[in-house]
Amino acid sequence: MDPNTVSSFQVDCFLWHVRKQVADQELGDAPFLDRLRRDQKSLRGRGSTLGLNIETATRVGKQIVERILKEESDEALKMTMASAPASRYLTDMTIEEMSRDWFMLMPKQKVAGPLCIRMDQAIMDKNIILKANFSVIFDRLETLILLRAFTEEGAIVGEISPLPSLPGHTNEDVKNAIGVLIGGLEWNDNTVRVSKTLQRFAWRSSNENGRPPLTPKQKRKMARTIRSEVRRNKMAD
């Protein structure tokens, strides 16, 4: 096993422990608590994959961090902080919308890289909007926390979430997963649009209505449908 993989996991475990202490003292805001919950699942998955005990890894991670801080000068720390790019946390959903349980009559699940896509295939002929909470850096999506699909009535009918066992994903991973979710929902004649925040940072190839352009496959299917409709109309005449 790569020693850097192990040490990275150990440090992540300790830093999560520190953030948990901050949360326990009620010093964390909503984005902080969101990331804390997601990272806990991620660490459990990584620990299982690596075969490492989280408690033991946390202790070793503490030793690594303490050694680094002991060697780090205040001036070097200031320079590091000044040169590090700052990310922003953007929210389409409330805490209630993010934490709400939801159920599927006809569940479908697909794994796309490090992301899990879930949708209810029983949903038909609905107007649906995709909303997400995520961080942004350099005007691009950095980390997806959670994306959900809502009907006009507020029901959750789809979701994209990071896989705890496969931490890390790219902007393209998210974009591809959004395309899969939209395609699945539109297959049942649902009308899907994307929130303005997602349009700006994660789904740039959309039209002014917040809907993605048709793929070549969708265009061919639509052309066949139109031709069939024209033929039927001519026969009726």
Swiss-Prot record:
The UniProt annotation puts the region (PABPN1-binding) at: 223-230
GO cellular component assignments = host cell cytoplasm; host cell nucleus
Instruction: Please give the subunit comment from the record.
Output: Homodimer. Interacts with host TRIM25 (via coiled coil); this interaction specifically inhibits TRIM25 multimerization and TRIM25-mediated RIGI CARD ubiquitination. Interacts with human EIF2AK2/PKR, CPSF4, IVNS1ABP and PABPN1.
* Entry comment on modification after translation: Upon interferon induction, ISGylated via host HERC5; this results in the impairment of NS1 interaction with RNA targets due to its inability to form homodimers and to interact with host EIF2AK2/PKR.
Residue span of motif Nuclear localization signal = 34-38
Tell me the segments the record calls region Disordered. Answer: 205-237
Record's protein name: Non-structural protein 1
Function per UniProt: Inhibits post-transcriptional processing of cellular pre-mRNA, by binding and inhibiting two cellular proteins that are required for the 3'-end processing of cellular pre-mRNAs: the 30 kDa cleavage and polyadenylation specificity factor/CPSF4 and the poly(A)-binding protein 2/PABPN1. In turn, unprocessed 3' end pre-mRNAs accumulate in the host nucleus and are no longer exported to the cytoplasm. Cellular protein synthesis is thereby shut off very early after virus infection.
The domain of life is: Viruses
Keyword set, alphabetical order: Eukaryotic host gene expression shutoff by virus, Host cytoplasm, Host gene expression shutoff by virus, Host mRNA suppression by virus, Host nucleus, Host-virus interaction, Inhibition of host innate immune response by virus, Inhibition of host interferon signaling pathway by virus, Inhibition of host PKR by virus, Inhibition of host pre-mRNA processing by virus, Inhibition of host RIG-I by virus, Inhibition of host RLR pathway by virus, Interferon antiviral system evasion, RNA-binding, Ubl conjugation, Viral immunoevasion
